[in-house]
Amino acid sequence: MIFITGGTGLVGSHVLLKLSQQSRGFKALRRESSSLDICKRIFSYYNADELFVKINWIEGDINDIASLESGMQDCDLLLHCAGVVSFSKSQTEVLRKVNIEGTANVMNIALNLGIRKVGFVSSIAAL
């Protein structure tokens, strides 16, 4: 089973599209407040609306340890696509909370659960 974070974003939505075209099971973490609009538009753009229902959405957050532990159960592959990109100094705390603390949470829980295969999406903004 594959666990993916950031599935409601641009890159994560494309990853979910590819996963939905395969037979392997997967779960996607999404925040309660997140919109599925980008993801739905990506599927629609590729004429794959019928595949959207294959997504097993898990409500949670990368800064919510309990939701991560629960969601990652029975997974053997993690695809971490969640993150915030901003060049604004006003976003410094959000960037730290999500991109540093959230990523550490995801990786630590993956290690604790024995998930040994990880794909990690980042950007030049991380530099």
Where are these regions (language model features)?
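NAD(P)H-binding glycine-rich loop region in Rossmannoid oxidoreductase-like domains
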Residues: 45-98
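N-terminal Rossmann NAD(P)H-binding glycine-rich loop of SDR-like oxidoreductase domains
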Residues: 2-23
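Conserved Rossmann-fold NAD(P)-dependent oxidoreductase catalytic core, especially the SDR/UDP-sugar
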Residues: 92, 101-127
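Short loop/turn motifs at secondary-structure junctions
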Residues: 22, 74, 114-117
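SDR active-site strand-loop-helix element
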Residues: 5, 29, 78-82, 118-124
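Short beta-strand element of Class I
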Residues: 25-27
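Active-site proximal helix/loop that lines the substrate pocket
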Residues: 34, 83-87, 123-126
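Glycine-rich phosphate-binding loop and adjoining beta1-alpha1-beta2 segment
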Residues: 30-50
